[in-house]
Every structure is written in structure tokens, then in C-alpha cells.
């Protein structure tokens, strides 16, 4: 092995080691960050724009049938754009994280109600992140029974057209890309609504 090959190999190994340490540091920083869901835009369930619906009479018969069948079969699909604010403990350091998959759950009055998985890559950074997502939506189950009561509470809250942040908790559990492969975070991260000023 020539002197230049040895130096090149040594520099390459140092770069890989530094990159791995940086990604581990970034992963820790994102785990310790504060998350705030700022906005949800263009929420569609099975292709139906539910943000424009004010009540049951606003749905066509086919839209209602499609949604009811999907809820009954636990095959509901959602697409939306989330605006997620990430506040790092050390904002002066530039960090980013690639999420390869993200489990999520929605709690209504502290009770797990809906859950799903986003299976497309997303990139997070400090600040406001615009995240267009498509996801499955299933009802949570306890002892084999679906949580229809939680879904009913959610529908009642939505129909009241008021601030839902006191009743809803959104949690995420991302799987992130690291130098040694994909790693799922060990627990859910609570994504609160915007902080009041």
C-alpha cells in the first residue's frame, strides 16, 4: 500500500467516523427538541376534502358511503400537509434528520383513538417544516374492540368548529436513517398545538 493510499484511507475513515458522530448527535438533538403542530392544510379522507364540510348534509351519498365503508373495514386513507415547527435546544447548530417511516397516533381526551403509518421519506430541520403526507388511518383497539367511542368524540368535537388543542394530542414515532441503518425511536414524541403567546 502506497503512502498516498494509506493517507486517503485514513482520511476516508475519519470522514465516515465524523459523519456517524454528527448523525448520532443530530438524532439526540431531534429527540430532545420541542415540536409544535402549527397548521393542517388540505385534509382529505379517501379523497374527500373534509375541511370544507360543515355537517353530515355536506357529504354526497357516495362520499358518505365510501367513508363509512372505510371506517367499518379500517381501511381509511388520509392525505394532508402538516406544518410542524421544530425548536432545537441549540438552534445555532445546523442539523437535519431523514425520517424513513413515521408511526403516529391521535389521542382524544387522553385516549388513543386513531393511528397510522406514513411510509414516505421526510426531512426535518430546525424551524418550520412543510410535510405533505399520505397515511393509513385505523382506529385503535383495546382487547380486540375498536375505539368507536373515541371516534364519536372526535366527530363531535370537529362538528363544534372550535379550538381542539385542549382535547387532542398528536404523537409521532419516527424511524430515522443513521449510518448503521434505520432506527425507530423508542417512544412516541408528543407534538402539541401552537403555544399560546
Go through each PLM region and give its residues.
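C-terminal motif of bacterial Sec signal peptides marking the signal peptidase cleavage site
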Residues: 17-20
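Extracellular/lumenal and peripheral-membrane lipid-interaction modules
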Residues: 22-197
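Bacterial N-terminal signal peptides that target proteins for export
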Residues: 1-8
Amino acid at each position: 500500500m502506497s503512502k498516498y493510499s494509506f493517507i486517503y484511507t485514513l482520511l476516508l475513515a475519519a470522514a465516515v467516523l465524523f459523519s456517524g458522530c454528527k448523525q448520532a448527535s443530530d438524532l439526540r438533538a431531534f429527540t430532545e427538541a420541542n415540536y409544535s403542530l402549527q397548521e393542517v392544510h388540505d385534509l382529505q379522507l379517501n379523497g374527500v376534502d373534509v375541511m370544507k364540510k360543515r355537517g353530515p348534509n355536506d357529504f354526497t351519498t357516495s362520499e358518505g358511503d365510501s367513508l363509512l365503508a372505510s371506517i367499518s373495514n379500517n381501511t381509511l386513507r388520509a392525505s394532508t400537509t402538516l406544518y410542524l415547527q421544530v425548536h432545537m435546544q441549540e438552534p445555532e447548530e445546523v442539523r437535519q434528520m431523514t425520517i424513513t417511516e413515521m408511526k403516529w397516533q391521535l389521542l382524544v381526551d387522553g385516549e388513543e383513538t386513531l393511528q397510522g403509518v406514513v411510509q414516505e421519506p421526510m426531512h426535518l430541520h430546525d424551524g418550520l417544516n412543510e410535510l405533505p403526507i399520505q397515511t393509513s388511518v385505523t382506529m385503535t383497539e383495546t382487547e380486540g374492540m375498536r375505539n368507536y367511542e373515541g371516534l364519536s368524540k372526535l366527530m363531535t368535537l370537529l362538528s363544534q368548529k372550535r379550538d381542539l388543542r385542549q382535547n387532542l394530542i398528536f404523537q409521532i414515532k419516527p424511524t430515522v436513517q443513521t449510518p448503521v441503518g434505520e432506527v425507530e425511536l423508542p417512544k412516541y414524541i408528543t407534538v402539541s398545538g401552537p403555544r399560546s403567546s
